[in-house]
Amino acid sequence: MKKYKLSILLASAVLGGVGATYLSAEVNEVSAAEVKTEVVTPATTTDKNEGTPAGATTSAAQVTAPKEVKNIGEVQGESHESPLVGKEVVINNVVVTKTDKTGFYVQDKVSDNNPRTSDAVYVASAEKVESGDLLKVQGTVKEGYMEEYSVRPGQTFKKPAGSLTVTQIINATITKLGKTDLPKALNISEKMPKDIVDNTPTKYNPETEALDYWESLEGMRVEVTKPKVTGPQYKGDIYVLPGDYKGQKLNNIGGVNLRPGVQNTEVLPITVGNSFVAKAKDYFNENITGVVTYKNKTYKIDPIDPNALKGLLQDGGLTREVSKIYPSEDKLTIASYNIENFSANNNGHDETPEEKVDKIANSFIKEVHSPDIITLIEVQDNNGGVNDGTVDGVKSGEKLAQRIKSLGGPDYKYTEIAPVDGKDGGKPGANIRVAYLYNPKRVTLIGKEKGGSEEAARFVNGHLEKNPARIDPKSVHFEKVRKSLAAEFEFKGERIVVIANHLKSKLGDDAIYGSNQPSVENTKAKRIEEAKILNAFIKEGLRQNPNLKFVLTVDFNDFEFSDSVKTIVGNELVNLMAEHEQGDRYSYFYRGSNQSLDNILISKNIKDKVVFSPVHINASFMEEHGRASDHDPVVVQIDFSKPAAPVSPEVKPEQGSTSNKEDKKDNLISQDLGEVATDANNDVPKSKTKEVTSAKNVLPKTGLDTSSSLVFAGISAMMAFFLGRKKRNN
């Protein structure tokens, strides 16, 4: 397999026209000048007793005598690229282990016992063979992409940028030697390197790096012990852990959470097809055997008999949740929900069907219990993906509000600021944005003029000048990105600023198992700059009004431990997801791991008055189970039944900090949801409740502070004044 220098060869129509087409989101179209075309002809077959037929296929490249190799390991080599690329080889005594529509896998009947080289290779051929056939294979060695064989006649193959290649034999002549037993399948998890994908790209280390370990098994028969499913089937793949997995601690649904600085290399993708229905916590009651392949920028296991898998899958019993946070008269409930490209357009592919509208509306009523304020992420304009210059999304938002009401929920009001056409990223023509639903019987959107699409939000005298308003919409850091939307609400006399966010996506990051190693988060720097803008906005609001309350909601497109989220938090906020129970700390599922793209941040002046929880109704499930979006909603509730203590302005020291433990009773984030508190930095369980300590210097008291000393001084002055008047009157 080729790791860095990616050559391209175009398969002929003989091998095309079948299978699901895959085109990467990051692709470079290959021009005719860049493509080396090889006509892959049907392999000719001989019987070992009949000799070579007169019609045996040859090519211009077969001028010199083919190299007879001892085993497939010589073809694969101890690297990601075959040392024999472009050479014609002859391989004897190889066994067919699996067939597909464009070829088959063969493996050495007798291993070379070198764990650093694969014993198997893919043969691109239309020849009819069966599993267990013993063959002699003669053909040309190629490094290519499995996606090539999904290209239909008349289509142009586009190289998947950043993808590895697969070692193949093309232009093959096949000689059948008989039948034999299949090689024993290796337990793929037994020697899988933990955490590290590839830290030394110039060296080949299958013993310590997962990328190289997978390469050393390319095409080989492997086995997974009674796999446990970690998440829903997506694009024909499921991700599993072996039933005897003994690695990191599992989360509450038997999966693994993403962790800082490492990858969950032990999670294994298995190809099952788009019709396969599975969710987190399901499991197989038998071992699964398959061959190792590579497609869509990841290694995966292609089962020997995919049709048998449905009969082996057992229901793990996971059901969609209902929030443990219920409405209360003196408590403000705020939910945030990425509703995945929602619009009023229900006509056409990739638009919003009525069934989805019902599912999302019902989730707000039945599973999230009709929150007072809802921040909506991924609202599209009124006609969705129709690229006609429409930017207004009021019909989209009001359609959801009306559906909630018709199904028995509150009569929500909708507010947004439409973006400039084509300026906020997302699906072309859809003009994605963040927006709000709010219950006017519970909260008031402070009545001020609404900000413009390119007008930056400002604080004047400690409150938003315009409401709602977009935060720094002209910043270069928010180009082609959804602009954060600030809105100031009043609840029972309390003012609170809610900020809905949808930061730069991760599209453009290197694939974890791609050709660029170590993989780089190319989008990270932009999110950090966006985070700095948000943190500065919070600081200014608190500078003007230290008692102003803030809630920042999803989607940050980053994790609770990420630099970008930590930058937003700064010294002014608390990340409730980072404080949440470790086993429940997720809202999204991607390539085998549970993760927390959806965080809720609050200002420290309400940290002792809140409860928080993600509500797991989507990320672990498929549409067949009721899934309405790819994200779970997250909910925070603030208890305003007793006033919060006044807060003085604070600044974060540039060098060092002073940590003073405060009274534990005043420092707990309420967790009546049965969570186990963990250290936010290293996830080490500490106690049943988590103490939040102050790590900041406090400025001198100002006139805004209502400290007891000032109150006492004021009372003393008033008493002196009235006593003086009494004496004069007497």
Across the structure, where does each feature detected by a protein language model lie?
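Acidic beta-strand-to-loop metal/phosphate-binding motif
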Residues: 16-19, 139, 372-379
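Extended non-catalytic accessory segments flanking core domains
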Residues: 52-333, 337, 341-347, 351-370, ...
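A cross-kingdom C-terminal cell-surface attachment/processing module
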Residues: 16, 669, 684-727
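Low-complexity, acidic Ser/Thr/Pro-rich repeat tracts that form intrinsically disordered stalk/linker regions
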Residues: 22-73, 77, 85-86, 644-696
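Gram-negative bacterial Sec-dependent N-terminal signal peptides
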Residues: 1-27, 710-725
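Divalent cation-coordinating acidic motifs and surrounding scaffolds
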Residues: 54, 62, 303-646
